Each structure stands twice: as C-alpha cells, then as structure tokens.
Amino acid sequence: MEKKRRTEIAEVGEFGLIDLLTKGFDPADASTLRAAGDDAAVVMPPSGEAVLCSTDALLEGIDFDLTYFPLRHLGYKAVTVAASDILAMNALPSQLMVSLGVSSKLSVEALQELYEGIAFACREQGIDLVGGDTKASMTGLVLGLTALGHAPKEKVVSRGGAQQNDLICISGNLGAAYMGLRLLEREKRVLADVKDPEPK
C-alpha cells in the first residue's frame, strides 16, 4: 500500500501556502472588487446599503476536536458560523476573511482539506473569500473569521430591536448539536479505554 505524501508547510512557505489554499476562489459577488492575493481586499456594497462586519474565532480543544471532527466539516462549519451573524441581522453575507494559527501537526494536505470545506460553504452561500493570514500556533489549530455583508440600512435588525408581540423564529432542531457532541465525546472515551485497556 502506497503511503500518502505529507507536505510540511515549511516546504511551500507562507505565501506559497496562501496561493495553494486560495486557488479557485474566484469572486462571484458584485461588491467584491479585489479579493485574496493582494495586500487588502476591496469591496463596494450597492449604493445606499450598510456594510456589516462580524468576527468569530474557533479554537481547537474548545470549539472543535480533531479526533472526531473532519477538517472538511470544520471548514464548512467555520463559514456557517461567520455567515450566521450577518444573516441574523437580516443582511446578505458577501465576503469572508480567514486567518489561521497552524500547529506543526498539520500538513499542507490537511489544510487543503480544511479549505475544501470552506470553498464548498462559500459557493453554497454565495460568499467570496477575500483574504486572511496564516501563522504558526503552539496551541493547536486556531481559525479567525471575519465576515462582511450588506443590506439596505433600514432593513438591518439588531437584538435590541425586538418588541413585545414580535414573531421570533428558530431553525433546526434545538439541542441536536449538543446531543451530537455528547455522543461523540462518549465514543472518544470508549475508544480511549479500548486503546489503553487496564488489566483486571
């Protein structure tokens, strides 16, 4: 059986890695004038629309566990987490910046898998990847996400704007993510016990 090649990040360098990961992320939103590959992104929302900006961070060991969370799924989740804040304010997410803190345990191939999930979610939601940064991390994988979106300023809603008798809607199954996490954590403990059995 042929062993998969593991490419260390040092072999391609920071800029080579960025080029490799952002290849194929062509801007689709009309408000994106310049995307990844320059010193800064350039965006121009439609006239009269407000720009919304939101930042999220995902930390290995806190927000996800790579023992049971595939990198492709993590990439998808990261985009969804970032976009949801923009959507919650009744705006359309249009651009995303992703900054990574990468530990030495991850290879170029692992990061490509992460970016496959990011690309899928961006295409699905019509979001352009317009930039980011990559640095070494001593504490595991760290994702920093900045989402931009736009909406007519009079249509933007905020948490503080809710009033009595307003209709409040939720989507998805309440508690399902928590229950799934509990099951995964249980399976992780079972696997650890099987891996390191104690003699009785």
What are these regions (language model features)?
Residues 1-200:
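Helix-biased detector of long, well-ordered alpha-helical tracts
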